[in-house]
Amino acid sequence: MKKLRLALNKGEKLRFLSHLDYAQAVERMIRRAEIKMAYSEGFNPHMKISFSSALALGVTAAAEYIDMDVLEEDSLESIMERLNRVAPPGLEVLGGKEMPEKVKKMMAICNFAIYEVTGPITDENADWNALLKPFNGATEISYEKVTPKKTRTIDVKEFVKEPIVASVKDGMVTLTMGIGIYPQGTIKPSEVWNLGKDQYNWPITTGYEIHRKAIMVENEEGRYTPLEINY
């Protein structure tokens, strides 16, 4: 048995798949490619596969990562080629590497993500540098985060530590934001967008699309993709 870590995309055609549906699409691709997989034991065996994150419905991603335990003698390159031959539109294997047999769950170590949120603007003459300055310069921003279980007040700047950057084209603005993912929680890019609209008067609407540009492991040495680490 060997453990492979693969980078996959979630393209536009899969935007409205939930994480569960996306995971099932990946498993179907593996079955179609006839990859011999290791399975869990018990009454309901399932493929030994784990994801770096749970992508929300409506979010695309430049790269999602999976760890998978395979019972194959085939090379990594051949396995990736077999998967891509049967991949559905919007899903592609972008790269991979063989990992040590025992690695940490990626969901436990991936703690930083870069998002691009794009939507229409209501003022094409807006100065986005000036509009973003109060948000980017604040040391603390209180926000009431509502979940099905409870409502709690969080400090947005605990999670959005770097300046948000705006680019405008054809009546649309793209806000690029780096967001920390910590044991105590995180903030959604949609929540940052709506907070900017409601509290900082950014000239945007409630309509937007979200693309996750990267998910990474951040430590004292820097930021790395899951393919750049060995744990």
Give residue spans per PLM region.
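Short amphipathic alpha-helices in soluble, non-transmembrane regions
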Residues: 79-87, 127-137, 192
